[in-house]
Amino acid sequence: MAENLSDQDCFEKLSSSKEGQHWFCSGLLTQYIQPTFFWFAHDETPSFKWVLNAYHERLRSCTSCIQAYYELRNESLAKGSYSFTGFSITDLQEKWNKWDIIRVLEDFKALEDETIDFTSLPCLIFETLLNPKLFTCKNIYKNAIDAFNGLLSDWCSNIFLPGYLLFFYEASHPDVLEWVHSFFKENTEIRISSATVDAVFNTVVFESQNSSDSDCNFVSISSPEFWERTYMFLELLPLQSITAACESILKDYLLNLVKTSESLSSQQMSCLRICCNSSSFWSAADSFKEVSSFLKNLLKNVTATPFEVSDMNWAYIIASFFRTCLNDFVSVFPEWLKGFVEEKRTIGFIIYSVLDALFDLLSLDYSSPSFLNNTLSLMNANSITILQDYPEYMLKLRLHSLLYDIAFISWSHKAITKNPSFVFDPSYELSPFWKLDNLQEEKISDVLFSKISSCCFAHDIEISENSTPSGTMVQFAELWQVMSEYISGFLKGFSEKSSTEISNMLGDSSKFDTVVSFLLSPTQPLYVSAFHIVQIITNCTKNRNEALKKLVAMDFRGIVHGLADAVLNWQSILSFFPALRIMRFLSITNKSLSSDNSAFTENDIPTLGAYWQCIWNILDLVFSNVARWSLNNPADTVKALMKLTLKFVDDLFQNDGIFIKLLAKFDSLILLGETSESLFSFIMWLKINDLELRGIVINSLCKLFTKFSNFDYLFEDRTVTFLTDFIIRKQKAHLSADQCKQLANVLTQASPEAKTVLEQHRLSEMRKTKKQTELTNSAHVIKPSPTPQITVKQNTTKSSSAPRMGMLEQLKQEYLTKRNFESKLKSSAVSSRKPTFNEVKPANLLAEDLSDNEDDIDRKQGLFSLAKANKIPEIRQQERRQVQLLSNSTIKMHPSQIRMMTNRNVANVKARLFPSMTDFYKEILSWEPANQSPNPVLKFHKLDGKIIDSFKTVEHYMEVLQPMIFMECWSQIQSTKLDLKFSPVEGIMVERTAVNNFVDIGVSVAPKDLYGYPLYDTEVVSLAFNKEDASSMKGLCCFAKVERIVRQTNGVLVVLRTLPSMEILNKLQGNCALWFLKLTNLATFTRQYAGIRGLPYFHLADDIIRARPCSQPVKHSSSEIKAAMKRYQVNEPQAKAIMCALDNNGFTLIQGPPGTGKTKTIIGIISALLVDLSRYHITRPNQQSKSTESKQQILLCAPSNAAVDEVLLRLKRGFLLENGEKYIPRVVRIGNPETINVSVRDLSLEYQTEKQLLEVNQGAIDLGSLQELTRWRDTFYDCIQKIEELEKQIDVARDVAEDTKSLGKELQNKINEKNLAEQKVEELQSQSFTKNKEVDLLRKKAQKAILKQADVVCATLSGSGHDLVAHSSLNFSTVIIDEAAQAVELDTIIPLRYGAKKCILVGDPNQLPPTVLSKKAASLNYSQSLFVRIQKNFSNQMCLLSIQYRMHPDISHFPSKKFYDSRLEDGDNMAEKTQQVWHVNPKFTQYRLFDVRGKERTSNTMSTYNLEEVEYLVNMVDELLNKFPDVNFTGRIGVITPYRSQLHELRRAFKVKYGKSFMSTIDIQTVDGFQGQEKDIIFFSCVKSYSKHGIGFLRDFRRLNVALTRARSSLLIIGNMETLKTDDLWGSLVDDALSRKLVESPHIDSEGRLITISRTSEKRMKNEEFVEPPSKKLANSEPSKEIRQRS
């Protein structure tokens, strides 16, 4: 022990410990540290100095050690105060405090001098917040305050309450005060000790008294602000913490003011008023004489001016004093008042004001109402007349009096029920106000009607037949008789109002709850009065059941709310007679629900869920308490309740019942989990001795088990164990063979473990029977071998031949026999069986382990023989449980296992988010820049074949797809080399560092050379020793990756990572000139590589490699789909897609053909996930959900910025909730602000971060600089938008051979303006943010906070892999990807790295696929999306959005038939909605093909064009414009073609025909460039004509689908029909148009057939390499009739 250790022993042990060992928090050296706290009593020795230094080192680096140090020191010195005699303990404490101050001050100075690491700062702040005494040092005070102010969000912990309280009195940092105030406001359950308050007040008082010697800026205790600050934190504390504060020196300060001051300030009065709520503020030692002077001064204001009823603080302060001495209030206070108050009315008012306050304070203490009996003697008819002139106060007093009676009756009934020997004052009299006629006065009636329900379950106390009621019971019965008559009369008076008036009043839920409560009352007059009210509002006076059914139909939600409140009230007494009434009420309610459950809508589901919870709570109470009730109530009545309950349970699960349907609406396991307690209580009824009831119990139990098993319910271990034991001991349980078999059958189906145990027992019994047969001559019975889990002893006691006792007799005797057997039972209660199924012994339940002796008692005494009849079970008053999933695990893991699992999870997350990228950069940086071959040379990755439909292992998947990244990257670099947009930049090499296998080269560059030269740390550049080599990438040149960019005062340092050859490395000498040229950005490729390297740790890894969607799609009923259609305002296919996305895990595929509302569906899914998913967390009506589930965050992605921003625009508008309110989710857009749509730029992370910084840190940022920064940033964005417009204009001008010099000059001016703006933004950001480390840290924290608070985070697929997202510890369980069919597979897996368990892919595989530059990669299926790969494997598990709202039916006819198996339907009235005036002209109808047999030509770029088609198309447009001059066609006409050369010719022709200005009214694009757009009229030029190479580009069915689905009202196709018919796909298009007589051609014969005039024999061609979309591969489709006939 520490007492026996010498100083030398302690020193040697401490000095021999390992370096860096944690001495305090580990607890290993406690006994050696404790004696050192007394060493300050002696002169300082070298040993002690060494120990102090060691302490200092450990307290500098570990917050846990700091906390343990103070606890250990205080504990040691406190113990030493009794035994240590060498020194004053107070002096010792003071010496340690001084050492702490010196130590902490040294560390702050060392931090400032940078002699210790910055990481010590948190420990210093931690200690100062923990120990307020440190604030007495002015330098510590200043440093700690400043540091805390800069890092506010890091210190949200109750550990620092001493420091937080101290900050309430800090005067120089209002922002700290505001933060601490917010912390207390948000954390409403803060617990503060009196010691904490003492420490804070001592510090503040010390500083106040020594203000001249201190720079610490605490408010003075003598100033009004001190009490204002005290009130500020007191009003935020719960009562428990106020009580603790009243046990501190704060109470002494206040009492001193009360006893010495003539008056108190308003701030002091406010503090005193709050403290008076605590019963510990005044003590019995505080005499009336001591405070009388204060009370007299307090009452001066009351007597001097007309009193106001509203301001009653003075009354509460006086009442708080008399709370501890009620006798003085009765005997002393009135006489004392007469000494200085003359008016009798004023005396009466003061007395009744204080009496009124006493009611409130005593109820706050949860005191017995009988404590006020003496004060009630003041309330008599004579004294009441004093207040007749003050009706408002008289009304309040009257209500208090009435409510007091209600509280007294309710409290007395509970007290006597729990303790029959309880005695209360028999002199109690009910209020005289009950006899007045004005109880129906609105102000009284409203309050009284809401409160009387608390005594609805009061009734005569239940006693056994042979017992004699006590005097208390008789007195209560008499009192209740009178009270019930009063209440009944009040209810009858209420029922005399008009039915309309009653209905309006019952619209208040509290009043409706009262009616429901009295419908459950066991007191007949009250029940009758309440029922009369029901008859009036339902207009049903004859049939009681019909009236109740109508009530349920009228307000089911109110019924459930009232029932729940009534049951909570009943739980506090759990008497028998209310149970009968409750069960009858439930039976009627259920019949009403089951008779017409079609009336219930989706909105009623939460209420039904709450009702379900309420039902099983009631059943649990009935099952658990029947044993106790049977002791004091007639047997027939108890049996009637049991039969009623059993029938009710059976009826719950009728096949057509409401709850069978309810289980399908929710996760059935969640709802059935509510039944676990009830089910275990129910199986105790198996021990009943009544044969009839036992049979009913077994049948009911078997039905329940069967129903639950159908829903895969996991029964609790204790339930299964009890039933298994019970079946094995069937003889002692009095079970017949059939009953055993019946129970065993359902049990084995429900539990495999039980099946194993019962089978082993059966085999054991067989061996036992055989053994006994062999030993017939033996004098004893050999015990059978034990079963593996349950040991069964052979009972040698012969059963009694006496007839079995009746149930009632047994239940009566149980009370007596239980005492006789109690000691015996205790000794035999230790079961010989082993625990089974992870069994945890239930606490305080009716059943215990079944020993032999207990079984004998069971057999003799029957039902509930194990209940402790002499002890009423404690009333369960727990808050109603929320619905939770049933936990399968009941075993606690060993701490080492927990640590291992935690470490493994952390490692997995790290591997998933931050895989090694070394091989990626090795591969790219090893490439030769001069190499111009189409494919790279791969040194570190091996090409391993095509992407197949399904992979078996992650490793194989990675081996195949990783090389695709490098082939695409190589192609990107080669493409950039052909069209260089930048020139090389010159710099000087200033540093060279070896990093692993790489060489990092620091190049110093002049800032002006980087203006307008966007360079990021993900760029790859060519690096050479001269400008020519860097540009041509020949000679001594290598690739380099930009590692980081450091802006310095004398230039910019660009650090380049390289893998140079020896020749280059040898030439890289100090200060040599280097040139680098920006080539391409590697961001997407690095994120793809990081994604695939982390794939083994993805939740969806197996689904990705096997390309499979959710394994078992959930089926939805028609009613659910209709409800979803109404909820989200969508059509049926969209509703199905939303529900599938909501219910399925894994991948969900939604195919959205053109115009079918993909975006609207996505918004519906987000709405369902963010808002409506809460319907699975059932709470009582009008009760706030307390779900502790983590925040649901959604990651929304798409391949392009435009697609992301399109959905974002819709999200920005918000969506409607079920109650009609608008909900706007918190949305954050991640990405380069340059690429984000202007309309949603305010949702960008950058914008929101700066906005938040401005709001929370105004003092740290110069407002002028910030405004200038905003102005330059706006200029930057405006320039980007203008540059995009100018580039489009130049593109068009070039096509029409127009001079672009002026446009080019304007473009260059805008580029220069943009570069200047970018330079200014960087400079201002550097000045405002990066120079201020604290603000820069706040910026990063703000970004993380914004991301964590977001409901939806939006980004491109590549952008979702941004490092900021990875480092923000975000977990997106749901990912939604729009346009998923346009993304390569490796892009799709990037957003899945954040723990995704649900991924919703939305797209259309029948439209254009992703663009892949590498022909080699494309040939290996790299251009195939993950969407398509999954579709190939599971085509029947796609949700098809099958209703289009874009095209006229004539236009949609062929795409629907050919590409969507005729399943693409038209929306309502689409023909009328798309009808246009030009349709009257037969040439410009909704859909038509024009046969133009021109000549195909090839341009220099090997692109095809057809001038005849150009001419024909221009003339058509001209004719359209001339024939309909009144129609404004601006922006309504689109011209598309598959070939870029044809695009140029078309633009040139229109320019010649109409001039330059016309080009802004018509949109001419390639088919690929027009995807995602739509126009009223589309002219489609096919180009191909008599080609030797077929129709080429046109053959891709996806391109054709895009082309045919862009038009809303008219689609006009111009092409050579003869050539087009040579292709199988296009031929079907021409044949379809011919059959519909929609082809205009001079080459059609009289029978409507196309005449062939080709000079070459052409046969219809079918592309062998590209397969047309088969009908079988459509979403959720079956083979068409045509296909089935062919097969």
Curated annotation (Swiss-Prot):
What keywords would UniProt list here? ATP-binding, Helicase, Hydrolase, mRNA processing, Nucleotide-binding, Nucleus, rRNA processing, tRNA processing
> Signal sequence span per UniProt?
none
Q: Which domain of life is it from?
A: Eukaryota
Q: Which GO terms describe its molecular function?
A: 5'-3' DNA/RNA helicase activity; 5'-3' RNA helicase activity; ATP binding; ATP hydrolysis activity; RNA binding; transcription termination site sequence-specific DNA binding
Which cellular component, as a GO term, is one annotated location?
A: chromatin
A single Gene Ontology biological process assigned to it is: termination of RNA polymerase III transcription
What are the subcellular locations of this protein? Answer: Nucleus
Residues binding ATP, per UniProt: 1134, 1155-1159, 1407, 1445, 1574
Stretches for region Disordered? 781-801, 1661-1687
Q: What class of enzyme is it?
A: hydrolase
Q: What is its main location?
A: nucleus
InterPro entries, per this entry? DNA2/NAM7-like, DNA2/NAM7-like_C, DNA2/NAM7_AAA_11, Helicase_Sen1_N, P-loop_NTPase, SEN1_barrel, SF1_C_Upf1
Composition bias, Polar residues: 788-801
Keyword Metal-binding on entry: no
The catalytic activity of this protein is classed by the Enzyme Commission as 3.6.4.-
Q: Which family does it belong to?
A: Belongs to the DNA2/NAM7 helicase family.
PANTHER family recorded:
DNA2/NAM7 HELICASE FAMILY (PTHR10887), HELICASE SEN1 (PTHR10887:SF526)
- Subunit record text: Monomer.
Please give the function described in this protein's UniProt entry: ATP-dependent 5'->3' DNA/RNA helicase required for the expression and maturation of diverse classes of non-protein-coding RNAs like precursor tRNAs, rRNAs and small nuclear (snRNA) and nucleolar (snoRNA) RNAs. Directs RNA polymerase II transcription termination on snoRNAs as well as on several short protein-coding genes. May also play a role in transcription-coupled nucleotide excision repair.
The name under which this protein is listed is Helicase sen1
Chain's gene name: sen1
